[in-house]
């Protein structure tokens, strides 16, 4: 039996530094075949502002609990309009193309869940969860829908919905706080 070394692909891990494992060539081919079918189904998504019909399947595939999907969808719609390439302060057209910057005050907010730079940028936070746990230490990987959902899941498992709840952000955000949610 011939051994093949595989690691995470750039599509799945972006900048992650994954350890390599020795497996059989047959297993490597089967894994790649499965990855190719997953990748092609997600690459076929045409993202449109306001449309998250694709989100359930992708979120479940990366590990989100089914009972959290309705709230996740509401947060994705509020934060990015369902546009995975969106950065904080950007204005997008109906096809999720960034057409201008309305403000430059929060450009570290990234992707579907508008994950803030304190979660990935060690120059802002030496305990940056995503950098330490997933080797996501820059904004670019978070502009991929699947990666953003995986990162958001880690944040949610660590902090619950707090990072996306304006009721927990302090008095200056009280106007954005919806009681009972």
Enumerate the language-model features and the residues they cover:
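Catalytic and binding regions of secreted/periplasmic enzymes and modules that target cell-wall glycans
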Residues: 71, 86-87, 94, 108-181
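Export/targeting segments at the very N-terminus of extracytoplasmic proteins
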Residues: 1-2, 13-83
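Conserved alpha-helical segments that form or flank metal/cofactor-binding pockets of metalloenzymes
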Residues: 80-102
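N-terminal cationic-hydrophobic initiation segments that often serve targeting/anchoring roles
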Residues: 60-63, 97, 153-156
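Core subunits and conserved enzymes of cellular information-processing
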Residues: 7-9
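Second-shell loop/turn segments in exported
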Residues: 40-46, 57-62, 101-102, 134-145
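Short basic/hydrophobic patches in alpha-helices and adjacent helix-turn junctions
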Residues: 74, 101-104, 154
């Amino acid at each position: 039996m011939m051994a093949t070394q595989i690691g995470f692909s750039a599509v799945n891990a972006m900048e992650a530094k994954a350890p390599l494992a020795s497996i059989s060539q047959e297993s490597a081919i089967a894994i790649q075949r499965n990855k190719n079918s997953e990748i092609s189904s997600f690459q076929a998504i045409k993202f449109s502002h306001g449309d998250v019909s694709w989100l359930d399947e992708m979120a479940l595939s990366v590990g989100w609990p089914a009972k959290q999907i309705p709230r996740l969808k509401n947060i994705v719609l509020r934060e990015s309009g369902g546009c995975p390439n969106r950065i904080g302060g950007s204005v997008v057209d109906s096809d999720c193309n960034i057409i201008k910057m309305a403000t430059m005050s929060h450009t570290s907010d990234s992707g579907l869940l508008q994950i803030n730079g304190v979660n990935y940028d060690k120059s802002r936070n030496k305990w940056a969860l995503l950098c330490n746990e997933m080797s996501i230490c820059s904004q670019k990987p978070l502009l991929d829908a699947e990666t953003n959902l995986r990162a958001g899941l880690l944040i949610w498992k660590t902090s619950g919905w707090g990072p996306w709840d304006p009721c927990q952000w302090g008095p200056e955000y009280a106007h954005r706080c919806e009681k009972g949610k």
